[in-house]
Amino acid sequence: MKILVLNGSPKRKKSDTMHITRAFLDGMKEAAPQEVHIVDIIDKHIEYCTSCFACKRNGGKCIHNDDMKALLDEVLESNLLLFSYPLYCYGMPASLKAFADRTMPLSSMAMKKQGGRYVHVGQADFSHLKYMMICGCGFPNSKQNFEPAVMQFKLMFPNNHTIITVPESPMFNVPEAAEVTVRDWHSSSRLESSMLRQAK
């Protein structure tokens, strides 16, 4: 399985949430071979979407000449797209939100009814993709913190998604918590890996 990890933390590999994500990925690798590529979004040149809709009229080509073209190509070549990020103002950090906004070339102007809402018709085939979100925050409570980020992810990826929210995530990144972090996250990720293989 090809896994593309989008690390939305400006702290890069020092991210508390990314520490949890790495433990989760290690567990998945124990369950089955995985090809993992971690991208620190903060280091990528990603211009803001200007909503010009050029990509909707020309078959998916964006007006910006930056790193998004290569990233979108890698997205479509992956099996699992994993968003790893700390909660910023009840949502994604700005650099990761810019990435999400720039996925516009994957869909056309045409719309279709899906369930109880309308969605854009795809310009690319991403039906094979599964999506995961691992989001951490420093607060001890999940309620009245993660709901906006969870709702956004569910609306963006209504099918084939897994959402993991972790309150007090900095606590998992201290040496004293290493054993618990490895044990618990390896166990849950082995189960997730098994479920993903069965869903193919």
Which residue stretches match the model-derived regions?
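Short Gly/Pro-enriched loop/turn and capping motifs at secondary-structure junctions
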Residues: G138-P140, S169-F172
